[in-house]
Amino acid sequence: MKEVSPTGRVLGIDLARFVAIVGMMAAHLLAPRSGAGPYSIGWLTALTSGLPSALFAVVGGFGVYFSSRRYLAHDQRAAAVVSLLMRGAVVMIVGFALELLPDHPIAVVLVFFGLAIACCAPLVLLPTWILVPIAMGLPFLGTVGGYGLSQVLVAKTPQASSSIREAVSALFFTGYYPAVTWVAYLLVGFVAARFLFDEGQARPLAPRALLLAATGAIAFGAGRLISALAMPSAVEYLCQTYGVGTDRAQQYIAAYHRGVPLVPPPLSFALAAPHSGSPADVLVSSGVAVAVTGLLVAAFSRATSVPRVLAPFAWTGAAPLTIYSLHVALTAATWSATDAGASGGAGTWWYQSEFWGQMIIILVVGTGIGLSGKRGPLEALTSSAAQQAARRFTADP
């Protein structure tokens, strides 16, 4: 198989990023047709409900690891923290900029993602044995806080908030992608990256990656089992509380919950409703993310260069911030130009076909970035800002 020259990147991680981006694109452009008569693709809604964004966040934890390990290897702890704080700030700024686009149906993840990166900045100084219980405990905190605050605060984004209190609540607990949950995802990825890439590991990379994938699969299975056991009680609660039938209650649970559990704790702890951020949901979604990432790293663990046939996908995945922002901008442009929101465009075949058009565009852009030998423009901006911020804390920038 023909190959392109090595880049020093981890091929499996770039491919995992690509899978995450395509999954989110499918959630935004293909899944809205789920249940739409003869074009029904309900299975796709189930597949893309929360899983691609979780993969995006977990692989983001790998990015936190890669961007901080050089500083930490030289005991430049302050530089590592400041660098990540700046990265998080830049990502948040990009996210706020995307919120200024014309109306569109996408809940932009970048404001929450950037905040989560900033929150992780001091945590990278901690040993793994402390990070693991933190990652495990955050979904419990998020579920309790999110459910409690959702009873009095309704804002899902800081932009939609009517007060500072609502904005803070949306960012950390009640938003579409609350930071408390995304910090947990980032820590899962960060710990996984330590397991795979820290020096001194006894086993080769491929066996470690396969063990990681197996761990993710076990986590997924455990989460689904726990949720299945909790489902009858959750359905009964919804039926009694809202006066709905069993089928409608199950539909409520299967729908998007955007960071807020549908039933109160402690029952919500065990219910893996998509986007709820519950412990069971995080166990299921992060399990899938870890399994996918582990398998891709294992499959290409011996690659010293990028196979030519995979180069467009790897190059596109290597610029996730740029490509994701491009996807949001393209979708907003279509939504605005066609007045899709008013005309129900998300349920039409032509809106679904935009997925394939955007796929071509992002692959062309990603290939162009790869052939240039440079980073994506937003990746370069983020990296430059982080390095400049860290420079004053180290003599070796």
Regions found by a protein language model. Name each.
Residues M1-P397:
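Alpha-helical transmembrane segments and their immediate juxtamembrane cytosolic regions
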